[in-house]
């Protein structure tokens, strides 16, 4: 593991324990929660996201927000902490399901709609016009995906393929992109040859295009290119905190 990643994981744990909202842990929590939720249509701003993480409240002058956006933002903070708590565990179906539970257990709308929380989907769903795995096939396809992944020498290409296949299966009723991107961050933290990154909302179109390229042509070039771009951005942001 690189010196940078050892430093990063250590700072995450120390700053979380101290409730430090001024370091790289808080930056990563806010940046990842904001961007990953924004990609999925969240209306919350970076300022609102920071206020929720720092204080558990929205700015006093805010007169509009969607309850679901707030609930999912808080759920994302919890999912990130669960990810940190399980870094030494193997990536399994149960671990992924628990990530989904942390993200979605407090979302009223999903519960009211009867969505499975912390479990695979019970109803078919689509990505635009693309048909994803049927509910009856999800468990088999997820097992095959994880079995394949654990046999591979880890690289950005393998990680991109894993992510694209995961999103094509779309194992949950909702929250697939956010759990998938959290898995990306996790696997980059724990694998020696990978570097962590956050997919930014400003690059949403490139990201969607990369997933589409894999679905249609089984190619990962666009996703890998984007991931390498985001690696540089995240490292640049983290360097600011390395001088304390």
Model feature map: region roles:
Residues 1-244:
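FIC/Doc superfamily catalytic core
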């Amino acid at each position: 593991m690189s010196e940078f990643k050892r430093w990063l994981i250590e700072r995450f744990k120390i700053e979380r324990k101290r409730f430090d909202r001024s370091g790289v842990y808080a930056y990563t929590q806010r940046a990842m929660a904001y961007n990953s939720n924004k990609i999925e249509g969240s209306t919350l701003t970076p300022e609102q996201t920071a206020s929720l993480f720092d204080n558990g409240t929205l700015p006093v002058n805010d007169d509009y927000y969607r309850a679901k956006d707030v609930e999912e933002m808080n759920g994302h903070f919890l999912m990130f902490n669960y990810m940190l708590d399980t870094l030494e565990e193997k990536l399994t179906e149960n671990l992924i399901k628990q990530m989904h539970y942390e993200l979605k257990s407090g979302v009223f709308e999903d519960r009211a709609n009867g969505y499975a929380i912390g479990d695979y989907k019970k109803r078919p769903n689509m990505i635009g016009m693309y048909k994803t795995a049927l509910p009856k096939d999800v468990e088999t396809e997820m097992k095959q995906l994880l079995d394949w992944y654990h046999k591979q020498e880890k690289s950005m290409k393998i990680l991109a393929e894993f992510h694209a296949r995961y999103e094509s299966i779309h194992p949950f009723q909702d929250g697939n992109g956010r759990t998938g991107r959290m898995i990306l961050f996790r696997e980059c933290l724990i694998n020696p040859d990978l570097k962590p990154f956050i997919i930014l909302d400003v690059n949403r179109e490139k990201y969607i295009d990369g997933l589409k390229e894999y679905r249609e042509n089984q190619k990962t070039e666009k996703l890998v290119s984007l991931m390498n771009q985001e690696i540089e951005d995240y490292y640049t942001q983290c360097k600011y905190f390395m001088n304390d």
